[in-house]
Each structure stands twice: as structure tokens, then as C-alpha cells.
A protein has these predicted regions:
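Bacterial N-terminal signal peptides that target proteins for export
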Residues: 1-10
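N-terminal leader/presequence-like segments
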Residues: 5, 24-25
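C-terminal segment of classical bacterial N-terminal signal peptides
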Residues: 16-24
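A motif-centric signal for short, conserved binding hotspots located
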Residues: 27-355
């Protein structure tokens, strides 16, 4: 029996090693050893970045896997670079190498206002102890995933378990309806959307992310599933509440006290100004990757034009900001503070009468 058990064990290990050295039938691409290590030992050296074993037999963590320089050829999105990324005026130019979320490089270099201070990348913000616009419930430093992060399940404290089933069961070809983590936009649990296959490396009006937004009639509507509702988990009063965005019952028809989000520009009182979005006339305007808008259309048909169907000109947080970071104050997409002497006025894409 002992010899039989030993042979069975040997065959099991051999089978596992064969799996790890060959193609792995998962949604992630490449061989399994690109991400996993069986024993954290190879040729008398440890395999993991830290030297210690990681959860789920991973070679690295979120930051380690997503640190590098985007070239347009890499299949894994890099959101942090150890060298200055190429951003240019808006981060969308042909000579830029950042993605839709921007890059953590600047905030990791000690520039607090240039991005989110994620644990492991940047020190806690020297000025802000709580997220601006927050209700005080989020206490502690932001992480990539888990209960203190943006990605994965908010019910899991640890980052790796929070992403369980995400990478292996992701199907990028379908509308991400938020019903499961694997079916959530960019592993942002419950958030809907349709992602560009190259993560907006050199985006155009014909190739970009499709962000989900909701045209609200009241700020009490939390707009579940929208990309802006994700931001509102930490920055609540910039998105929803009571008299936080517009006083009383005048949401969309009266005076704003904070910039609206999850609101369709076609419903604005001065809608004629916004009908000129990105140089258009109010019908079939070209989509802007510099100042993008969200849509309520939940299909894989890309929104290459705006003012084409109902609720397709929805202002969102990402119309102005990069989620990870940028070289500009407040993680803005463009250098508004340098305008008009220099920089780019992305505000003018929507506010056409004020440029």
C-alpha cells in the first residue's frame, strides 16, 4: 500500500506540474506559472516577489502584477510605472502610454493630489485623513481590493480572497452586468460596463470603454451599477445624499451646488450649450475620449456618438478625473490649472459656450 500511495502522489505532482507548464484553460491568458507557484521554490531560489509564500499560490500581488510600462503589446494592464509615464496633454495622444485609469506613478512619488494614495504604492495623504466628500464611514488607507478597496468583493477584508473567481471566469466579450464579480466591469463588484480590450491604450471615438451611467431625477437615487456610484462609496456627497448636489427638489432644473454626476446633459435647463458637445450639433455628436460620458445603454454596441439614443450623454466622475492618477491636480484628465496660458481646457468639451 505504501508503494502504491507514493506512486499515486508522484503521479499527482507530475500532473500538476504538467498543468502549470502548459496552457491553462482560464480567462486569463498565458501559462499558469505566469501567476502561480506550486512551492515558491525553483532552482534553489524563491519565486515570489516578496520571498514569502502568497495566498492562492500567487507569484505576486496586485501591485506587482500591474507594475510596468504599457507598450500596446502587453496583455496585462499596467497601472503603475517606476519611471515617468508618457501622458502629454490629455493622456489620449499617440505618444502617451497610460491607460483609462491613468497611472499611480505621480502619487507614488509623493504628489498626494495627483492620485489615490493606495497602500503599498503611496504613503497616507499628508493633508486628508478621510476621502473628500465622504460621510466618515471609510477609515483607513485605501487598498486595491477588498473591504478597503475598489476592486473585488467589499465583504472580504483580504485583497486576494476578494478577487476570487474574477480573473479565471472573466468573459470580456459580454456586457458586464455586475451580477457576479467575474461579470462586473473591471472586477468592480456590481458595477456595469463594457471594457475596451486594450484598456484605452491610445483610445479613439471608435475604440474606448463603454461606461454605464443613469440619468437621475433626484440625488437620493444612488444609481446602482453606474461607474459614478462606485466613486460614491467613498465620496458620497459628491454624488448623492440630501441637498448635497442640488438644493431641494430642483435636481436638474435649478441651481447646482456641486457638479452633477449621473445626469444626462440633454435634460439641463441650458441644454443648448451642451448640445455642442465635442464640436457637434446635438445629434450624433462625435464621442470624446478626452471628456467621456456614460450611457444607460446596456449592450455591447459601442457608443461612438453622443445624442444618438436616450440617456447617452450622462456626466460621470470619469468625465473629468482619472481613477488611479494623473500628472495633474485632483487627478484631472487635463491640466486645467495651466489654462488658458497653457494646458488643455477639457471643461470646454461640454461647456461649449464658456471655452
Amino acid at each position: 500500500m505504501g508503494k502504491k500511495t507514493g506512486l499515486t502522489g508522484l503521479l499527482t505532482v507530475t500532473a500538476l506540474l504538467s498543468v502549470l507548464s502548459g496552457p491553462c484553460p482560464a480567462r486569463v491568458t498565458g501559462v499558469c506559472v505566469n501567476c502561480h507557484t506550486m512551492h515558491n521554490s525553483q532552482n534553489n531560489f524563491t519565486v515570489t516577489d516578496s520571498g514569502s509564500p502568497n495566498q492562492a499560490l500567487l507569484v505576486s500581488d496586485c501591485i506587482g502584477c500591474h507594475t510596468g510600462q504599457n507598450t500596446g503589446i502587453n496583455t496585462e494592464p499596467y497601472v503603475h510605472d517606476t519611471n515617468p509615464p508618457l501622458y502629454s496633454a490629455t493622456g489620449t495622444e499617440a505618444d502617451s502610454n497610460t491607460l483609462a485609469g491613468g497611472n499611480f506613478y505621480w502619487v507614488s512619488s509623493g504628489l498626494d493630489r495627483m492620485g489615490h494614495n493606495v497602500e503599498g504604492l503611496a504613503a497616507p495623504d499628508a493633508t486628508l485623513s478621510l476621502p473628500p466628500g465622504g460621510d466618515g464611514s471609510f477609515v483607513g488607507q485605501l487598498r486595491c481590493a477588498g473591504s478597503m478597496g475598489c476592486h473585488g468583493s467589499r465583504l472580504e477584508v483580504e485583497q486576494i480572497p476578494a478577487l476570487k473567481g474574477g480573473h479565471h471566469y472573466k468573459d470580456h466579450s459580454i456586457w458586464q452586468d455586475g451580477s457576479t464579480l467575474a461579470k462586473s466591469y473591471r472586477f468592480l463588484d456590481t458595477i456595469q460596463g463594457f471594457g475596451d480590450s486594450s484598456y484605452e491604450y491610445h483610445p479613439t471615438d471608435l475604440r474606448h470603454n463603454k461606461y454605464y451611467g443613469i440619468d437621475r431625477s433626484a440625488e437620493s437615487d444612488q444609481a446602482a451599477g453606474s461607474i459614478s456610484s462606485l466613486c460614491a462609496r467613498c465620496h458620497k456627497y459628491f454624488h448623492n445624499g440630501t441637498d448635497s448636489v442640488a438644493p431641494g427638489s430642483t435636481f436638474g432644473t435649478g441651481v447646482w451646488i456641486r457638479h452633477p454626476t449621473d445626469f444626462d446633459m440633454s435634460n439641463a435647463t441650458s441644454s443648448s450649450e451642451y448640445q455642442g458637445y465635442n464640436g457637434g450639433s446635438g445629434t450624433g455628436n462625435p464621442y470624446s475620449v478626452i471628456s467621456p460620458v456614460a450611457t444607460a445603454d446596456a449592450s455591447t454596441t459601442l457608443n461612438t456618438t453622443v445624442y444618438t439614443r436616450a440617456n447617452d450623454a450622462v456626466v460621470m466622475c470619469l468625465s473629468c478625473h482619472r481613477a488611479h492618477g494623473s500628472p495633474y491636480t485632483s487627478s484631472l484628465r487635463w491640466d486645467y490649472k495651466a489654462w488658458p496660458a497653457g494646458g488643455y481646457n477639457g471643461c470646454g468639451v461640454c461647456h461649449t459656450s464658456k471655452d
